[in-house]
Every structure is written in structure tokens, then in C-alpha cells.
């Protein structure tokens, strides 16, 4: 399942090879994903979707509202009948007749359009494209869709788009400068350098065919908003001035000599990683869920810990949440995170993975979790087979 560009307002199947490929029959088994979430309206939902990897289509989709007393109210439940040619929907309770009619009209259009493309499309994205209702079932579906669209995902090599504000807004640069100085990076301040766009110079070293595609895409995207992109390990922000000229703004760093500024590409991998992470401090007011893969990548262990402590202090009164993977065992500290917030991933004999919480071990709160983990108490550590080395030496 892929969250497409927000302007396209789509959730669709992009890659059908994400099944468990070690099992030869894995592609025949459906992939089932279910989420428990709280929307901006403070309502709790369970949204689920089942996809067929073989047919490359959605075979089931459902949305349930979780009431405060723990009871469940079905918002919709979509399935495909035995023939595979028709959608079926469960009965839904509506507050009034007007809302019921609107929902039936939506289902009538959705159900009649059971094309191959529609089988790949979620109800969430279809409602987002065709409805602007402010109440009722359609509004609830839209709220859940917006929750998915608000998710921030940072992979080790990804570039968070919040950096666009850094090169465009002075107050953001001041904030960045303070945080970078606090983390002892050697950077005194973050500056910006403007000039007219020179595509040939910026795209130097990139194959001409790819460079031309980038030029076209940037020129189209820049019509509405500033565009940020990264090329040759340098970050640029582009916008059009009043005369239609494309202006580029480049991020620069002052390491103590304002006359000799450093480019983004001059910084260490750890400092560049901080540029990806610091914009997250702005998101605590938006109640977003933030996924970070390898949060500790290229960072000193003390810095990673302090980053999390700062984030926790900012989000104490909000519903913002970080879900991160790490190999830094020093973060396994019950003074930093709760037992139910620590999860391990263990590879099983069939090469599948199993997730389980530290909470199952019911450890004392003064336990040194990092030491116990490295000793193998919780599994989820590499096991070195010395016999393999012996066989290689024979």
C-alpha cells in the first residue's frame, strides 16, 4: 500500500512484491494490515485493508469507530463477492436520512465502477477525491484519510521536506542555528545564499536525460509553491519571483568565519542527519505520527538520547508520537522509555520476523535493559556460528 502525493489524494497499490518471498506460496496469501489510530477530532478508529499480491488488488477494506466505552461501530466494510466482479458492503447506521442517502449515492457510484483500477483503489482515497462533506460517515472517512496523509516517514537516506522552511524563513534558521549549536556540531549559524537558477551548473554530473526530466518536473511544481530538492548532496529551494524568474536559495553554514561559509555537502553525515531530524520539533503541535528508520544513524549515542529527551519535553502535552528503529542498545533505558514502548524483532528459523514487547518480561524498573539485551536475555541479537569459520579455514 502506497501513500501517493497529497495533491493526487490517492492510496493505492504500487509494489506487489512486498509479500514474504522466502515462502514460495507467499504471493498467494493476502497481506493484511490494520491500524488503531486517533484522528484530529479525537475519535479512535480501527482501519484495515487486505490485499492480494497475486491479483494486485484490494480484496477487503474496513473502518470501525472505537467508542469510549470500548464498543465498536462499523463505518464501512468492503469485500469482493465470490465472482470477483462485484463489491459488497455491510449495513451502516446513519444519524439521519440525509446522511444515509449521501452514503448510498457514493456506494452506488463506487460499486458500479469495478474496473481493474478501482480494485486497486481504497475507499479512503476515493472519498477524498469526490467528497467535501463536513459531517456524517463521509466526513469520518475523510478524517481517517487525513491521518494517513499526515504521517511523516524518515528513512536513512530520505530528505524531510520541512527543510524548505529552513532556507526560506529567517526565524526557522535561527531556531536551527540554536539547536545545532546546542548539539555541539561546531556550527555557529545557518545562512542562506540566493541567486538566479542555473540548471546546467546545479545538475552538472547528472546524465542529461535525467537532468531534463528534473528540469521539467521542477518547472511544473514551482508554479504554486517553493520546491526543495537535493542534488549532488546539496540542498536547494526554488521559487519564482514577481517577474517569473526562478530564484534558487542554497543553505550554508557558518563555522566561526562568516566570510567562509560551508555548504551542506561539507558537513559530516551526523550533522546532515540532524538537518533531517530537527524539523520534527515543529510537528509536535500537529499531533502527527512520525516513523524514523535507524534514528541513530551517524549520530553519537549521547546525541540520539538527548534528541529524544528534547522531543519528549516538547510533545508532553500533545498527541505527537515517534516510532523509531535503532541498533543503539544504550537507548534501552527505562528512564528514557517505558517497557511497553520497547519492542524487539527476532528472525525465526523460517526467516520470517517476530515482534514482541519488553513488557512481556515484566522487568524491574531498576533493571539495566541494555546489558541484559546484549547478554541475549531478550533474544533478537545476532548469533555467530563459529563452525562456519572453521569450515572456511579447513
Question: Model segments located where?
Answer:
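Single conserved hydrophobic/aromatic residue that forms the stacking wall/gate
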Residues: 1-9, 13
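Switch/communication elements of ASCE P-loop NTPase nucleotide-binding domains
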Residues: 7-10, 248-388, 392-394
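Flexible phosphate/Mg2+-sensing switch loops adjacent to catalytic phosphate-binding sites
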Residues: 14-26, 335-336
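Short, hydrophobic/aromatic-rich segments at coil-to-beta transitions
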Residues: 27-36, 57-60
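Short beta-strand segments that buttress and anchor functional surface loops
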Residues: 33-39, 63, 252-253
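Glycine-centered tight beta-turn/hairpin loop motif at sheet-sheet or coil-to-beta transitions
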Residues: 40-44, 256-259
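Electropositive, glycine-dotted interaction segments
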Residues: 46-213
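Conserved NTPase motor "head" modules and their coupling/switch loops across ABC/AAA+ ATPases, GTPases
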Residues: 147-289, 360
Amino acid at each position: 500500500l502506497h501513500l501517493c502525493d497529497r495533491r493526487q489524494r490517492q492510496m493505492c497499490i504500487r509494489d506487489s512484491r512486498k509479500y514474504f518471498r522466502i515462502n514460495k506460496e507467499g504471493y498467494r496469501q493476502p497481506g493484511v494490515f490494520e491500524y488503531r489510530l486517533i484522528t484530529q477530532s479525537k475519535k479512535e478508529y480501527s482501519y484495515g485493508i487486505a490485499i492480494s499480491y497475486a491479483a494486485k488488488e484490494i480484496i477487503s477494506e474496513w473502518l470501525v469507530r472505537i467508542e469510549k466505552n470500548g464498543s465498536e461501530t462499523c463505518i464501512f466494510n468492503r469485500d469482493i463477492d465470490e465472482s470477483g466482479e462485484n463489491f459488497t458492503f455491510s449495513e451502516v447506521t446513519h444519524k439521519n436520512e440525509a446522511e444515509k442517502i449521501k452514503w448510498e449515492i457514493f456506494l452506488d457510484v463506487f460499486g458500479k465502477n469495478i474496473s481493474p483500477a478501482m480494485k486497486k483503489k481504497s475507499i479512503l482515497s476515493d472519498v477524498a477525491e469526490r467528497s467535501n462533506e463536513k459531517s456524517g460517515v463521509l466526513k469520518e472517512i475523510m478524517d481517517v484519510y487525513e491521518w494517513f496523509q499526515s504521517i511523516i516517514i524518515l528513512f536513512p537516506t530520505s530528505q524531510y521536506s520541512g527543510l524548505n522552511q529552513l532556507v526560506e524563513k529567517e526565524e526557522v534558521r535561527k531556531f536551527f542555528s540554536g539547536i545545532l549549536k546546542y548539539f555541539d556540531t561546531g556550527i555557529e549559524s545557518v545562512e542562506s545564499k540566493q541567486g538566479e537558477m542555473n540548471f546546467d551548473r546545479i545538475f552538472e554530473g547528472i546524465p542529461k536525460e535525467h537532468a531534463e526530466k528534473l528540469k521539467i518536473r521542477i518547472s511544473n511544481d514551482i508554479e504554486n509553491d517553493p520546491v526543495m530538492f537535493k542534488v549532488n548532496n546539496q540542498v536547494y529551494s526554488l521559487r519564482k519571483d514577481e517577474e517569473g524568474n526562478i530564484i534558487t536559495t542554497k543553505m550554508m553554514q557558518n563555522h566561526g568565519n562568516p566570510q567562509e561559509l560551508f555548504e551542506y555537502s561539507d558537513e559530516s553525515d551526523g550533522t546532515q542527519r540532524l538537518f533531517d531530524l530537527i524539523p520534527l520539533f515543529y510537528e509536535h503541535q500537529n499531533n502527527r505520527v512520525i516513523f524514523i528508520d535507524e534514528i541513530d544513524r551517524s549520530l553519537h549515542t549521547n546525541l540520539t538520547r538527548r534528541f529524544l529527551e528534547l522531543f519528549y519535553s516538547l510533545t508532553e502535552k500533545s498527541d505527537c508520537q515517534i516510532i523509531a528503529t535503532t541498533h543503539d542498545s544504550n537507548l534501552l533505558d527505562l528512564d528514557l522509555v517505558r517497557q511497553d514502548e520497547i519492542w524487539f524483532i527476532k528472525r525465526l528459523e523460517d526467516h520470517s520476523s517476530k515482534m514482541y514487547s519488553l513488557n512481556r518480561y515484566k522487568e524491574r524498573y531498576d533493571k539495566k535493559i541494555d546489558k541484559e539485551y546484549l547478554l541475549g536475555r531478550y533474544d533478537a541479537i545476532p548469533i555467530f556460528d563459529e563452525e562456519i569459520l572453521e569450515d572456511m579455514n579447513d
